[in-house]
Amino acid sequence: MRVTDFSFELPDSLIAHYPQPERSRCRLLSLEGPTGALTHGTFTDLLDKLNPGDLLVFNNTRVIPARLFGRKASGGKIEVLVERMLDDKRILAHIRASKAPKPGTELLLGDDESIHATMTARHGALFEVEFNDPRPVLDILNAIGHMPLPPYIDRPDEDADRELYQTVYSEKPGAVAAPTAGLHFDEPLLAALREKGVEMAFVTLHVGAGTFQPVRVDTIEDHIMHSEYAEVPQEVVDAVLAAKARGNRVIAVGTTSVRSLESAAQAAKSDLIEPFFGDTQIFIYPGYQYKVIDALITNFHLPESTLIMLVSAFAGYQHTMNAYKTAVEQKYRFFSYGDAMFITYNPQAISERP
């Protein structure tokens, strides 16, 4: 399969630079997987689409203020984007500079350059950085870091983004990008879903900066997926198995929840799914056999991205590309701060190729 098979025309005017004033008031395009039928509505229509006993699986990662600005002690300006917190003193990061720093290079970070750090090692495209500061890494990031808005949101981050680019149920700090399907849930909607009898469970996948990297090969099968840390605890496994046993659906909120659950299913030895704690490089594209997910809530993704490939593997290639064409025609808002889709599984998708 060719990467260009997943391309589509997207006017810049449809890229959302700010979220809707009310989280749950975004538009919702529903795609019926087996038939390809499309319906238009608003996000709160989920109340009618979900049944008592259905299980929503959320990603409770919390976005950290992962973008730092500063300079090398020798003078050159740098931008640091944290990929992962290694411990209380060290991070793994992308560093943008006119000349890549060498091990031992001193870095002065923050608007006032008051935070001292040292680049200690290089791991491929990533740099290991150690802070020379008594505070834990997370405290330093909260003090001097900027919210790492995606590259297609072409504006500086604002104070409001610290709340808006965060799900209301975020709990475990570690992501450098929000699991954006979850941004549409507010407390009243969550309360209404619970009232209806919809079950909820929480995985953790710390979204890395690799999620924004373009696919740089021509053939999908040649792409090497970036690695991200995921946790699927026993209580999630129990909730999934219980939902399946009673004939209810497992509904993933976002592609990160999909990748977490499917990673846990791939690693399972005997059961459908088992607990999973570790790095995952799962790459889902047409031909993949889904094991756990029955429905998916997700935003609209970039052309030629691994995420539109994941959706195509779930709903079917033709149905997915037709839905995106319709979304563009109907002027849906795209990407992180944009509108959402509700998609049910297409069992024929596994045999469909572009």
Swiss-Prot record:
Q: Which GO terms describe its cellular component?
A: cytoplasm
Biological-process GO terms, alphabetical:
queuosine biosynthetic process; tRNA wobble guanine modification
Which EC class heads this enzyme's classification? transferase
Chief place where the protein resides: cytoplasm
Which SUPFAM superfamilies does the UniProt entry name for this protein?
QueA-like
Source superkingdom: Bacteria
| A GO molecular function held by the record | S-adenosylmethionine:tRNA ribosyltransferase-isomerase activity
Quick one: which pathway? tRNA modification; tRNA-queuosine biosynthesis
For this protein, the Enzyme Commission number is 2.4.99.17
Where in or outside the cell it occurs: the entry states: Cytoplasm
Catalytic activity from the UniProt record: 7-aminomethyl-7-carbaguanosine(34) in tRNA + S-adenosyl-L-methionine = epoxyqueuosine(34) in tRNA + adenine + L-methionine + 2 H(+)
Q: Name one Pfam family in it.
A: Queuosine_synth
Record keywords: Cytoplasm, Queuosine biosynthesis, S-adenosyl-L-methionine, Transferase
Residue ranges the record marks as coiled coil: none
Asked if Ion transport is a keyword of the record, the answer is no
Similarity comment: family membership = Belongs to the QueA family.
UniProt function note: Transfers and isomerizes the ribose moiety from AdoMet to the 7-aminomethyl group of 7-deazaguanine (preQ1-tRNA) to give epoxyqueuosine (oQ-tRNA).
Q: How does it assemble?
A: Monomer.
PANTHER family in the cross-refs: S-ADENOSYLMETHIONINE:TRNA RIBOSYLTRANSFERASE-ISOMERASE
Name the UniProt record assigns to this protein: S-adenosylmethionine:tRNA ribosyltransferase-isomerase
Question: Source organism lineage?
Answer: Bacteria, Pseudomonadati, Pseudomonadota, Gammaproteobacteria, Enterobacterales
